[in-house]
Each structure stands twice: as structure tokens, then as C-alpha cells.
Amino acid sequence: MANKEYPLAKFRNIGIMAHIDAGKTTATERILFYTGKTHKIGETHEGGATMDWMEQEQERGITITSAATTCFWKDHQVNIIDTPGHVDFTVEVERSLRVLDGAVTILDAKSGVEPQTETVWRQADNYKVPRMVFINKMDKLGADFLMSVGTLRERLHANAVPLQLPIGAEDAFSGIIDLVKNDAVIYKDDLGTVMDETEIPEDMKEMAEEYRTMLLEAVAEVDEDIMMKYLEGEEISVEEIKTALRKGVLANKIVPVLCGSAYKNKGVQLLLDAIIEFMPSPLDIEDVKGTEPTTGEEMTRPADAKAPLAALAFKIATDPFIGKLAFTRIYSGTMKNGTYVFNSNKGKRERIGRLMKMHANHREEVEELKAGDLGAIIGLKDTTTGDTLCDDADPIILENMEFPEPVIDVSIEPKTKAGQEKMGIALAKLAEEDPTFRTYTNQETGQTIIAGMGELHLEIIVDRLIREFKVECNVGQPQVAYKETVRKHVKAEGKFVRQSGGRGQYGHCWIEMMPTEGEYEFENAIVGGSIPKEYIPAIDNGIQEASQSGIIAGYPVINFKVKLFDGSYHDVDSSEMAFKIAGSMAFKNAMSKADAVLLEPSMKVEVVVPEEYMGDVIGDINSRRGRIEGMTPRAGAEVIRAFVPLSEMFGYATTLRSKTQGRGNYVMQFDHYEEVPKSIQDKVIGERK
């Protein structure tokens, strides 16, 4: 079965995404069970789920890394990426979306759209990924299908169109009405493999009629032929509805909504059918865009195995037995075992050792990967996340991925002297796998600092150090990852001259430094050769190294641009080293004049509390320097949305529990960096000294 060749039109590359605990991994497990990939269904709460293969995931019952799996259903090849729902791991979601063609969002029928669903949905909007929604846990207490559909419209502004209605809810959930075919499916056994297709139950006919009309109106909006038929009262066939639905989904105009209970095995096969019917194949999406490495001109590559190779390494993982795996999406062309590919980001040729198709943590070796495939490559030494692999005769650089800055850091030290080197190697490997995890040495204290997206993120990193790399370490208290930036446009000089017998050192440069919104930029505006070309990168390096430790409190400096406009050199004494030091001196001089300020991470916080505690909770948020953005009622509770500095949120869970007698809960995620008030800045500087 697995070795059969599938045409591209029969490929589906989809992601499964959701808020934590909406039942995403369970749904993926059921899909693998029905498509014949696993013989025993894994349960998350037993710690046996196939997709969750890192030990930490099985213990915590959450998904941390997105596993990529290939399975087969009704003569189609479906590649599934299971993405984490915890806010600390948005990077995994971001990179999965970059390589998917479509996504299934899973909601908990009791809660509808939750904050992390919104985050993931916005990320999917950025990549224009067509989506469908599976409302899960219909068997749970408080399950409400129509409320959940309502939250899709209100909170995500999605054109949510139910294709199904549940028959019963909670314990009485027994089947599903199919509005497209206008019939019903009743489940007869616990495994969901025995089901009866019957007529719609009498007591639901009226409701089904009403929702089928809404479905027809939605497809008529995207298809003129159906619009004409609908207005003239003609019968519209099931095939016509499906064709129009597919068209609406691909254009991001319709979001089909299905329902079920993955845990009770209800609705999963219908979900698989819908993935095949409505999700895009690699041929349906736009040709992938990129740039020519030398000229920078825009190019595109079609989804065609005969076209030149263009592939994106979207995730690096380290396997204890085979070393480094590069998970890759092939957009065009073919990649063969044992051949060379060109990494256009690094400008290096790399040899492919072996090619794999992945099934959670089992692998199948293959001879080649073609356009549309998702697979893993073994043997690439220099490739990191976001790199493009192509033919050196036909180079292209695909659009890279952008990752957020880490917001929280802790100091870490090995328990033994011997562990120091081991820890350094392990941290470098982990940083290579995860672009939102950074590690650096604090220049003032000499401590090793690790930084990430949240406490859970760093906990899991430390856990992996102990388990995978056998490094025992002591970890400090979590600290806020402050940053520094500049507010003024200034000019500054850096001059490094040393004459002390023998060959001297000479480096001299003038720079302009200015604030920007985006990443660090370096512009070389030298004319007339006042500094030779070969020394320019050294100045850039000197500035970048110096920017790791700002002048206010030694935090990394962000959001600035440097323009190198003048300088001088010495025929004999100038060297790269001298210019690197001159660059760092110019940076420090510029910073001291540029009105430097401290920045802190501001978090987007959502608190759900019963109405009677609202006053207390809002008062507490204000006392934490929070800015209330708005409030919305939700089923007997209020949702308070606010921006609060991360430094004020440590220990918030305990406070919220005591203020609401355990009935309040909250989620937060990083939103942006903003300036720290002067009084707080002085306090932070005092604590650093």
C-alpha cells in the first residue's frame, strides 16, 4: 500500500491544530487507527499516544513537537502534522503552517473558540491556509455545538458553515446528520466502525432543513451556477454542493464545520472523508515563491516532480540513534537518496545520507521524495530551520520563517565541572532544533542563560538535558528577558589603535545609528574605499557582538539600524580583528548618546471569571500595571482581555485562585515589547548590579 505511487491531486498535506486539551492528539490517533497505521488506539491519558513520542509528552499528556505522519485513506495519501496547542510552543505551529496546504482546527464543544485557537487562527491567516473545523468532545458534559459555531463567527470572524449537526449531546450523543447528503449516521458500536446510514430522525427534520438551507445559501455565494439554480428553486445535487464547497474552502471564503467525539470514535471517518473532499492538494495552492540568490529577483516553482528542486527544511530534530533529522517539505522537483543538494541560504552543497517518511516515531526508508511530499533527511550537516534546499544549477531561496523573540530566561549551571562541556554541546543542539530557544553567556556574571517562550518551554528543555543528554544541572529562578533599544538618531566614531612594538593594530569607522521597527539592519554606505571591502563584515560582526549586551543593564539591544558611512585604514596595521573592535567601540559610543531605554515583554492576558469576582480581578490587573482592552460575557462568566507586563505576572495563578475561590482561569501569550517606566527601570538596573 505504502509503496504505491499517488498522483499529486491525491495528496493532502494538512495540520491538526487547537487549543491545549481540545482533543487534538486523540483525533490524530483515531485517524491513524482508521487509516490502518496503528493497530491499537493510543490514549493520551494512559500515556500511549503514537504521535506523542517524546517521554515528556507522554508524561504531561500534551504535544510539544509536531510529528509528521503519512497515512492513506480512500486512495489518497494524507500527510498529517500534529501541532502543539500550548502557547509556549507557537513556534512549532508557525513552522508547520508554513509547509501545510490545509488545516483542521479542533474545538472543544464545551468551550468553543479559546485564546490559543485565536492565536493559531491568526497564524493560519498570515499563511492563507484553507481551514475546516471539527467540534470535538460532543459526548462531554456541557457540549454545545451551536454555541461553538457561534464563537467561530464572533471571535474569529470566520464564515463558519456547518456540514453536520449532532444527534443528541453529552451522554445522549449517538449520531450525526449529514447536511450535504441530507441523511443521518447512527453509531452502533464503541469503535465507531459499525454505523447505519438512515433517514434524519423525525424530531430533527425541521432543524436539519433550516441548516441545509444555510449551507445551500453559503455555497450559492461562491458559485454562480448554484446561485441560479437556487433562486429558481431547482434541485442541487450532492456533487454540485461538494464541488462548490471545495471551491469556497480553497478560496478561504468558507470554513466547513463538522462534529463528533474522537475519544468515542464518532465522526472521525466522516472527518477523513471531508479532508479528502474539501482540503487542497499541492496542485490547488499557489506556486511557491522565492528569490534568486544573486539577483534577488522573485521566482516561482510549480508543484511538479519534473521541475527543478525546491524544498524547505522546516524542523531539525536530534534522534538518539541516527543523529540529526531535517524534516522537509518538497515543493517542486525530486530528491534522491545519496545525491547532493544545494543549501542556498548557507551557500553550501550537502549530501543526502538517507531519506525517510515518518510515522510519529517509526520511520520508513524511501529512495526519493517528490513534489508534495513531507519527509525527513539524514546526513545534512549545515542545514538549520528555514533553509532552502535546491539544485545548484537552479538556485532559489524560499521565503524564510519569522520567529518571535524569547521572553523569559533562567540561569543554568551543570552540577559538576565535567558537565560544563557536555552542557554546552547539548544546549547548542537544542538551540539548533528550536529557533525560539536561545542560549548565551551573561558577560558580567559569566553565567549560562537559557531563554524561551515560557516556563513550560524551559522546563521541557531542562528535562531533555537530563534525559537525552544526561547532563545534571541546577536551574535559577525564571527572569524576564528585558531588551534595550535606542530612541535617537546619532553618529558615532570607533577608533582602535595599538602601537606596542612589532606590528600595530589599526581600525577606524564612523557609523550612524537609528531606531527601527524591525530586525537589526546593517547598511554599508562607504564610497571611495575609505575602508576596504574585506573589513566591512568585521565591523558588522563587532556591532552584532557588542549589541548582545547593552549599556543600561547589559540586556540584548534590538530594533536598531546601523549605517557605516566613513572611516580610515592603515596599509600595514589594519586587520579584521582591529575593525571588529572598532565596530564594537562605535556601537557603544553611539548607544551612550542615543537615549537608550529598557524594553519589557507585554503579554496578552485573557482571564475568565464568574461575574461576581470581576471587580476584584480587574482591580488586581490594574495594580499589576495592566491595561484592560475589553470584556465579553460568556456563559455565566466574563472574559477580561488585557495587556500586562510579564514581570507582573509571576505567581498570578495563585492570586487568581484565591480571589475567585478557584473558579477563575487565565491564559497569556507574548504580544510585543514596550518601554519600561523610569521608576521600574531604575529598580531593574539595581537588581542587575
Swiss-Prot record:
Disulfide-bond pairs as recorded: none
GO molecular function: GTP binding; GTPase activity; translation elongation factor activity
Keyword flag Protein biosynthesis: yes
Record keyword Transcription regulation present: no
Residue ranges of the TM segments: none
Domain tr-type G: residue ranges: 9-283
GO cellular component, one term: cytoplasm
InterPro entries in the cross-refs: EF-G-like_DII, EFG_II, EFG_III, EFG_III/V, EFG_IV, EFG_V, EFG_V-like, G_TR_CS
Alphabetic keyword roster: Cytoplasm, Elongation factor, GTP-binding, Nucleotide-binding, Protein biosynthesis
Binding site for GTP: 18-25, 82-86, 136-139
Function: Catalyzes the GTP-dependent ribosomal translocation step during translation elongation. During this step, the ribosome changes from the pre-translocational (PRE) to the post-translocational (POST) state as the newly formed A-site-bound peptidyl-tRNA and P-site-bound deacylated tRNA move to the P and E sites, respectively. Catalyzes the coordinated movement of the two tRNA molecules, the mRNA and conformational changes in the ribosome.
Stored HAMAP family: EF_G_EF_2_B
Family: Belongs to the TRAFAC class translation factor GTPase superfamily. Classic translation factor GTPase family. EF-G/EF-2 subfamily.
Name of the protein described by the UniProt record: Elongation factor G
Organism: Clostridium botulinum (strain 657 / Type Ba4)
